[in-house]
């Protein structure tokens, strides 16, 4: 932690800017094993790309069996003694801890061997670094270790003559970024074989096309988008690999939502076979019909194409099996691993407070009496039930902000129905929107968590902190509320912290709730 704080202060100092700019890769280690229960990266060996703000520490878990005999050069006693003398540490030479820490399987030695061996370091410097245009400026990103090993796995499959398969990486693990890195990597891979590649990223929803376009352009790729059958048919038959005149790397993002089951959208005739087409197929867990779907016809049209399916939840049933349609798994990265690496937050189901549970039960009974024997969705959307539920949500959320000392946390309320979402939003605007509590009531709040520091026990600070944690803004996301651009803007405002709450209705199953 001390070293991390030190590097953060240095990199935020304008005088260190030149050193930050020339730094490509950093490794931090306290030579301890990872503690997967830690919320923050506190112990272990981590790698990061430089940042003018705070470097993002990444875990590294070696997946390949390394030949230490070939990679590591034996250390002579003279060299060891010279280093110890130079640091005035000869006394530790016979120390058991020093002897143990020389072993190649210690955390620091492991990450150094994994990342700094000649071949790996060359790969990282050439393909694993990217400048990303974020909302807060230009950031330098480094490839996550599952993306690195997935890229190497793709290379092995291609070397073995296998041209299709599935990458099973959990939701939120950076599958679009993986596709970006492999545009660069596979371009060089095929050019070494005198082959010109042409890259496609195929999605089946317009919002996914927009998201992919944003992800690719922010990383510097030129993006060509296709959203119609005729445009895709023309593009796939064209001999032109890129559409820009500067020679920059390019990818074509295709939304097949309107024509994915059209058997004639891709035709074998007039097909240029001199181009190596590489398809990244997003969300291949969806139920594509293997007999009449777009993807089946795509397979028939270009047998030589490379098809890489991306999914976080593959289909394993008898009717639709992802492996049957798209090939065997190229690489896997599961939900639990992503949680341990800090890329995915752990889902926690908590019981609601007893007093509110009783209040909600009473409100539900009252709503049932008022509504009579009707659809339960109408009961759950009745103000008699919705209002106490909203009170509990807001109160519990504001307490969580205080307990976590983070007023930037946002909340998404996934409602039982569109009617319930509308009612919640209407009541929120009536009771909470832009209505900060008075100074006196906030200072006297009995269950408001107090900080331990003496300097922070004044009534003014408590009032200020209480007001910062207040929920005062929200948006309603429904298909018939606002236009597409407005809904998109509301979601973006929520992501950057301009909105506290989103009230949404998403008819998803419990299993797909994390994707909502």
Each language-model region and where it sits:
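ATP-dependent helicase/translocase motor core
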Residues: 1-198, 207, 211-222, 247, ...
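Structural recognition of the conserved hydrophobic beta-strand(s) that form the central parallel beta-sheet
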Residues: 28-29, 252-255, 280, 306-311, ...
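Interdomain helical connector at the RecA1-RecA2 junction of SF1/SF2 helicase-like NTPases
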Residues: 101, 320-408, 424-426, 430
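Inter-Walker segment of RecA-like/P-loop motor cores
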Residues: 217-264
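Conserved C-terminal RecA-like helicase domain
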Residues: 247-250, 377-504
């Amino acid at each position: 932690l001390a070293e991390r704080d030190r590097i953060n202060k240095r990199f935020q100092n304008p005088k260190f800017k030149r050193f930050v700019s020339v730094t490509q890769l950093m490794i931090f280690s306290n030579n301890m094993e990872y503690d997967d229960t830690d919320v923050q990266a506190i112990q272990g060996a981590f790698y990061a790309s430089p940042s003018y703000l705070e470097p993002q520490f990444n875990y590294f878990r070696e997946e390949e069996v390394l030949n230490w005999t070939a990679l590591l050069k034996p250390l002579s006693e003279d060299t060891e003694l010279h280093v110890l003398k130079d640091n005035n540490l000869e006394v530790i030479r016979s120390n058991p801890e020093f002897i143990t820490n020389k072993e190649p399987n210690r955390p620091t030695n492991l990450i150094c061997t994994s990342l700094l061996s000649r071949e790996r370091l060359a790969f990282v410097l050439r393909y694993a670094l990217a400048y990303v245009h974020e909302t807060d400026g230009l950031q330098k990103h480094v490839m996550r270790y599952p993306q690195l090993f997935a890229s190497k796995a793709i290379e092995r499959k291609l070397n073995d003559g296998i041209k299709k398969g599935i990458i099973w990486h959990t939701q939120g693990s950076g599958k679009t970024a993986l596709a970006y890195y492999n545009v660069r990597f596979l371009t060089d891979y095929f050019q070494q074989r005198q082959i010109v590649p042409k890259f496609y990223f195929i999605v089946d929803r317009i919002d996914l096309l927009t998201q992919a376009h944003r992800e690719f352009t922010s990383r510097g790729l030129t993006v060509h988008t296709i959203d119609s059958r005729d445009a895709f048919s023309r593009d796939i038959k064209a001999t032109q690999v890129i559409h820009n005149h500067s020679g920059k790397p390019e990818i074509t993002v295709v939304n097949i939502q309107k024509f994915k089951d059209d058997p004639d959208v891709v035709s074998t005739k007039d097909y240029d076979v001199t181009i190596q087409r590489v398809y990244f197929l997003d969300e291949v867990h969806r139920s594509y019909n293997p007999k009449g779907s777009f993807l089946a016809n795509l397979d028939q049209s270009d047998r030589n194409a490379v098809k890489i399916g991306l999914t976080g939840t593959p289909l394993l049933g008898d009717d639709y099996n992802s492996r049957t349609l798209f090939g065997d798994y190229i690489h896997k990265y599961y939900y639990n691993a992503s949680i341990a690496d800090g890329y995915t937050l752990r889902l926690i189901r908590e019981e609601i407070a007893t007093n509110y549970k009783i209040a909600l039960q009473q409100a539900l009974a009252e709503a049932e009496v008022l509504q009579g024997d009707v659809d339960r969705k109408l009961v759950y959307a009745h103000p008699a039930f919705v209002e106490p539920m909203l009170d509990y949500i807001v109160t519990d959320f504001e307490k969580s902000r205080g307990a976590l000392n983070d007023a930037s946390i946002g909340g998404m309320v996934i409602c039982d129905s569109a009617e319930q979402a509308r009612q919640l939003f209407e009541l929120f605007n009536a009771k909470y929107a832009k209505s900060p509590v008075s100074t006196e009531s906030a200072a006297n709040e009995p269950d408001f968590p107090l900080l331990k520091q003496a300097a922070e026990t004044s009534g003014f600070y408590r009032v200020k902190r209480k007001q910062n944690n207040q929920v005062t803004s929200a948006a309603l996301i429904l298909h018939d509320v606002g236009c597409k651009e407005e809904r998109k803007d509301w979601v973006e405002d929520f992501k950057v912290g301009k909105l506290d709450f989103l009230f949404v209705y998403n008819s998803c199953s419990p299993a797909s709730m994390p994707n909502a």
